[in-house]
């Protein structure tokens, strides 16, 4: 059983530091890839956060790791750029990731997903183009991001989709843009947004 052993200012600092570390990791990753001129797209929870921020700052959620999508031919350049910046490359069960310390948790990592790879038995990952440019960084178009979230459809993906539904970013008109089973997954969330 977990008990409160960390309290007071130490607890506040720990909670704030966790969020700030993720934000710094995202900014550092983007700066490295931009400087190296390696094509990429921020995906996952941070891409959702960027889209949600366009509508309601209070609705944003953070996520533990940073996910980027790159083309397989650019992976060597990503490895070179990230390791030159002091990050440690690791490949765990086929997933390339970068951590700040060799013994760091995969939760504290930058995960690199490859265009064309099939994740969790779904569709192949999309290309990074067409892209959406958010001034300082690149992400995928909203339609592509929604498709990726419908494809993965883990609980956290469902929550991200529900956040976008609750803000009106996604509505019933989106369902016809996707083939089954993705359309059915979206309709499931639209029909019962409270679970």
Each model region followed by its residue ranges:
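Compositionally biased terminal segments of proteins
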Residues: 1-195
